[in-house]
Amino acid sequence: MGYDSSDDACVYQVSPEVAVIQTVDFFTPIVDDPYLFGQIAAANALSDVYAMGGVPKLAMNLLCVPSCLSLQTVRGILEGGHSKAVEAGCVIAGGHTIQDNEPKYGLCVTGFVHPDRILRNVGALPGDVLVLTKPLGAGILTTALKGDLLSPAARDEVYAHMATLNAKAGQAVLQVEQVHACTDVTGFGLLGHAFEMTQEGSVTIRLHGRALPLMRQARELAEMGVIPSGAYRNQDYVRPHLTLLPGAEQVF
């Protein structure tokens, strides 16, 4: 793997049969519950290995802790992360903790993949079909959480999706021979990640807005203007490469 694309992780081949996938990801809390935060952060970090076609096997905790944070809260975060690692069949073998002004948590993850089965986030070909394995809208809903704008059902839905491993989706991808590009939709949004998929070929991606699966309340909140700041940056990034067809509806 080289430096010419924005792949989800780095890959290093160690033998004709084995390549190592290495990735790291951590962030500040997006939910109040420490255990759930640990689960979400761990699922997010593990996801990059699945997106590359691999299986996570080893991880290290990365934890930033304010001095005011209780031991019970810290334990909850770590136990949440550990629960997702166990579910993934991945061993957390230690980690590193520092004092910081704001709590942050995530994992450095090592996974393995056969060199012939590495998936990249570039290389989409004409005729490919885009498959989404989770509904969209987590960024909008987590922004709404800060203002207490979510119904209990919408809150539970976004919590469940964010804490769900992409393991089953990763396993399904491995059963399909002709997967030309794969990624997990995270910080750059659907449009940003879709644009990346077009970078190693003269292809365009056509999205039908009404066919996209959305989380409960996502559209309603977007129409209210509950938009994370990152969405506007993503919009600016893809705008030169984006064409809205006649009849397409733009919410923001």
Language model region names:
Residues 1, 9-12, 47-50, 82, ...:
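A generic local secondary-structure boundary/capping motif
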Residues 14-30, 36, 55-150:
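Glycine-rich anion-binding loops of enzyme active sites
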Residues 35-52:
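Alpha-helical scaffold segments that flank or form the walls of functional sites
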Residues 36-40, 123-125, 146-149, 194-202, ...:
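Short, solvent-exposed amphipathic alpha-helical segments in soluble enzyme
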Residues 69-91, 100-103, 175-252:
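Glycine-/charge-enriched secondary-structure boundary and capping motifs
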Residues 96, 122, 133, 158-162, ...:
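Glycine- and other small-residue-rich loops at beta-strand/loop junctions that grip anionic moieties
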Residues 108-118, 152-175:
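Active-site glycine-rich loop that binds ribose-phosphate moieties when present
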